[in-house]
Every structure is written in C-alpha cells, then in structure tokens.
Regions:
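SAM-dependent methyltransferase catalytic region
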Residues: 1-176
C-alpha cells in the first residue's frame, strides 16, 4: 500500500496485472499452464517512461508481482527458465520513450554542447532531429517481431497502454 507502506496480500491486490494473475491462478491447474498464461498477461501489459529513473522500479515491480503470485499459487519459487522468459517480455514491454514524439528522449547530440555556467534560459527538452531513433516495441501475437512504435501507433486499432510510468509534467505538450 503506497500510502501506508504495508504489504498487501496477493489475494487482495487490485492492480491491472494483479487481476490478470489472480484469474490465471484461479483457472489453471498446472505450473506449465500458469507460466504460459502469466507470460501472456505480461505480453499484454505495456508501459513507457520518459526519464528512465522510474523505469527500473517499474520493471522490478512487474517481476516481483509475477514472482509473488507464482509463490502464492505453488508455494515455491518460480523456475529460472520461466524468469528468463519473463525478463525478456518485461524488457520489451516497459521502455523509455518521449510519449509526444515516440522517440528515445535525449538521444540526439547537441551540436553546441552544454554550457555548464549558463543558468538562464536553459532548454532541457529533448532535441528532436531526423536521425533520432524511433522506439521499437515487440508485437507478440501478430508479427512476432519488433516493430517501430510509429507503425503500431499508425494502425487502425492502435495500442493502449496500461501504465505510463513517471512523475508528470516532464513533457511540454506544445512540442512534438
């Protein structure tokens, strides 16, 4: 519980991924089925973060959530082979991105360099250039390959995000 710091029992959690994992625990009878559907639940859970500092925390929280649900169901630690697959899915589905441009923040070089002694009107917004890399996401079901975020965004059905991690407002909505 973020307001008290008290741990919430697995069976009482109501997060988006928690609800999926609770249903999986209820309807599966074998470890293999549980692992299969838990991976599918993580595949269907996307999120991006602008700064990068909260990204590690979000990834760790997803990993710990799945591990705690596994332990709650089977009363043993999840196997390493399952955790490796899970780690890959988490790494692809939670990434760093400027949500306004669909690109990696702060990756373009400033041709003038940083002026460490100027504290006036410093523009710390990401530099957007033609060569700035586009973010890529993994299409687990339809393509089974990485695709550019712009391509996914352009599809008629689009992509919904379960989480946008971070502490807004870091982005200026007038840019991008």
């Amino acid at each position: 519980d973020v307001s008290t710091g008290a741990e919430i029992e697995v069976s009482s959690r109501r997060g988006l991924l928690d609800r999926k994992l609770l249903a999986i625990s209820h309807f599966t009878e074998t470890r293999e089925d549980w692992q299969h559907w838990a991976l599918r639940a993580v595949e269907a859970t996307y999120g991006y973060e602008f700064q990068g500092d909260n990204l590690l925390i979000a990834r760790v929280n997803i990993m710990k959530t799945v591990m705690e649900h596994y332990f709650s169901k089977w009363e043993e630690a999840a196997p390493t082979s399952f955790l490796r697959k899970l780690t890959n899915k988490i790494a692809w589905n939670l990434w760093q991105m400027d949500g306004l441009s669909g690109r990696i923040p702060y990756c373009a070089e400033d041709p003038e360099g940083a002026d460490l002694f100027s504290f006036g009107d410093i523009d710390i917004r990401p530099l957007l250039s033609v060569g700035q890399p586009v973010c890529r996401v993994y299409s687990w079901r339809s393509d089974c390959q990485s695709v550019s975020y712009e391509d996914v965004k352009a599809r008629s059905c689009g992509m919904r995000f379960d989480y946008i991690v971070g502490n807004p407002p870091y982005q200026d909505e007038t840019i991008g």
